[in-house]
Amino acid sequence: MASTFSKLLTGRNASLLFATLGTSALTTGYLVNRQKVCAEARDQHKLFPPSADYPDLRKHNNCMAECLTPSIYAKLRNKVTANGYTLDQCIQTGVDNPGHPFIKTVGMVAGDEESYEVFADLFDPVIKLRHNGYDPRVMKHPTDLDASKITQGQFDERYVLSSRVRTGRSIRGLSLPPACSRAEAREVENVAITALEGLKGDLAGRYYRLSEMTEQDQQRLIDDHFLFDKPVSPLLTCAGMARDWPDARGIWHNYDNTFLIWINEEDHTRVISMEKGGNMKRVFERFCRGLKEVERLIQERGWEFMWNERLGYILTCPSNLGTGLRAGVHVRIPKLSKDPRFSKILENLRLQKRGTGGVDTRAVADVYDISNIDRIGRSEVELVQIVIDGVNYLVDCEKKLERGQDIKVPPPLPQFGKK
């Protein structure tokens, strides 16, 4: 219910108050009262016990729904981060979206760096479930951006059509996209593009604001897999990441269109190296070199990326913690993709398949997007090498099937570098 003071601020009453009290006094009083009203509204749910607020997850199939219990919910429901982010905001996207037909989604997001600590009783088991047993309570995440360690990074281009490596980075001290204010999002954009202006050589390029693009230009970039899609995915909309679109969103790319930075989509930044063909070693070398240079330029301006030794690089979705890295190829495998052993082969190689256009798309002309399923517990070098070895195995299987030969399901890869 609106307070008497709030009602006074409507219609002609507001004008009279401005004239009588003066702008400064009224503004101060209004802001104080508004903060009180917002706090009261946020605390309304506390009038009910946690059991009355517990979400109905009986038909859900995501990691959050599998890990959340009434006792965990009761323990965490009334906690908030320093930025005011709550457990219910973390899990809302998973409550609104029971599951996915092709992949098991996480079902929750973080609103800021502190979310992973304040709500660790839920985030930690979700991370362990999603990341093949990685336990952030006792394990430490390795980082390695030495591209010279990669071997056999050239694919057979009769099968592999394109190669790509991406990651995300978050700027410490600013809320993540689910909780980002307009001012914070604009600050992310400003920090990023100011740093990117310092890139030289083959990394040099320019920034394009989404708000200044035509619809035709946007769609062309989306179709060419350069630009993120419009904010229609349930993850973005239900988690609040589509707010104020397209304000403070954009894409930076070098003049060769092989090194890209997305600004303010699911994460503060997405750093991408890509090119046609099968030279994954060259793509990864450019990725490592560009990422290191971007971080150096960010730090020169007094900022840093969110990182800790338990979780690695901090990003919005727990699925991207650690390296945040997804190394992928578009590969044409018409025979293997129809073999009943295909899914098991991918599982044992720690790979996942998506349609030609990514998540929620189908394979066109038997072309699949194949990438690493893990993000945390292994270094960037390890994950890219897993993709290289795995895709070479898939191509070898395709060639054997073309010759009428049998193929084998490989043994499962050991966890986290264990021998």
From Swiss-Prot:
Residues of the transit peptide: 1-39
Q: Where is the Phosphagen kinase N-terminal domain?
A: 46-132
Q: Which residues form the Phosphagen kinase C-terminal domain?
A: 159-401
Entry's Gene3D superfamilies?
Answer: ATP:guanido phosphotransferase, N-terminal domain, Glutamine synthetase/guanido kinase, catalytic domain
Q: What is its EC number?
A: 2.7.3.2
Positions of the UniProt region annotated as Cardiolipin-binding? 40-64
Catalysed reactions, as listed in the record: creatine + ATP = N-phosphocreatine + ADP + H(+)
Whether ATP-binding counts among this entry's keywords is: yes
Query: Which positions does the record annotate as the modified residue Phosphothreonine?
Result: 356
Xref: InterPro entries? ATP-guanido_PTrfase (IPR000749), ATP-guanido_PTrfase_AS (IPR022415), ATP-guanido_PTrfase_cat (IPR022414), ATP-guanido_PTrfase_N (IPR022413), ATP-guanido_PTrfase_N_sf (IPR036802), Gln_synth/guanido_kin_cat_dom (IPR014746)
Which sequence positions carry the modification called Phosphotyrosine?
A: 255
**Which residues does the record give as ATP binding sites?**
162-166, 225, 270, 326, 354-359, 369
Q: Which CDD domains match?
A: creatine_kinase_like (cd00716)
Q: Which domain of life is it from?
A: Eukaryota
The UniProt subunit note reads as follows: Exists as an octamer composed of four CKMT2 homodimers.
Any remaining note in the record? Answer: Mitochondrial creatine kinase binds cardiolipin.
Q: What does this protein do?
A: Reversibly catalyzes the transfer of phosphate between ATP and various phosphogens (e.g. creatine phosphate). Creatine kinase isoenzymes play a central role in energy transduction in tissues with large, fluctuating energy demands, such as skeletal muscle, heart, brain and spermatozoa.
Name under which the protein is recorded: Creatine kinase S-type, mitochondrial
Organism this protein belongs to: Oryctolagus cuniculus (Rabbit)
Gene name, Swiss-Prot/TrEMBL: CKMT2
